[in-house]
From Swiss-Prot:
Record-linked NCBIfam families: rplT_bact
MF GO annotations: rRNA binding; structural constituent of ribosome
Species this protein is from: Clostridium kluyveri (strain ATCC 8527 / DSM 555 / NBRC 12016 / NCIMB 10680 / K1)
Any Pfam family the entry gives: Ribosomal_L20
Described function: Binds directly to 23S ribosomal RNA and is necessary for the in vitro assembly process of the 50S ribosomal subunit. It is not involved in the protein synthesizing functions of that subunit.
Name of this chain's protein: Large ribosomal subunit protein bL20
Listed PROSITE patterns: RIBOSOMAL_L20
Family note: Belongs to the bacterial ribosomal protein bL20 family.
SUPFAM superfamilies (UniProt xref): Ribosomal protein L20
Annotated signal sequence range: none
Record key words, sorted: Ribonucleoprotein, Ribosomal protein, RNA-binding, rRNA-binding
A single GO BP: translation
Gene (UniProt): rplT
CDD domains: Ribosomal_L20 (cd07026)
Cellular component terms (Gene Ontology): ribonucleoprotein complex; ribosome
């Protein structure tokens, strides 16, 4: 059986990792082992960040809707309940956009929710 020399594959792998580590400080962009550790950590953090982003935006939308609803005299949970029972299907992202960009329309939505809840 022939001997396998890994020089080409190893060099290719090292080049790939060092390219990903471009712009890192000091040895983290020059030395393979530290660069590899940094790249692995960076990729893991990027993966986790993509998951957290969804949670963070949902929280932001809820905070915005709650603030706008309270200005109109209704809490977030009561507002959402009133909207759901009225049969209005608007997601939180759109509600938060309406609350910021078109307060008049949002006030009308709050009135619909209040009428549905008999408040």
């Amino acid at each position: 059986m022939a001997r396998v020399k890994r020089a080409v594959n190893a060099r290719k792998h090292h080049r790939k990792i060092l390219k990903l580590a471009k712009g890192y400080y000091g040895g983290k962009s020059k030395l393979f082992k530290t660069a590899n550790e940094s790249v692995i950590r960076a990729l893991r953090n990027a993966y986790v960040g993509r998951k957290l982003k969804k949670r963070d935006f949902r929280k932001l939308w809820i905070v915005r809707i709650n603030a706008a609803a309270r200005i109109n005299g209704l809490s977030y949970s009561k507002f959402m309940n009133g909207i759901k029972t009225a049969g209005i299907n608007i997601n939180r992202k759109m509600l938060s956009e309406i609350a910021i960009n078109d307060p008049k329309t949002f006030t009308e939505l709050v009135q619909v929710a209040k009428a549905q809840l008999n408040v």
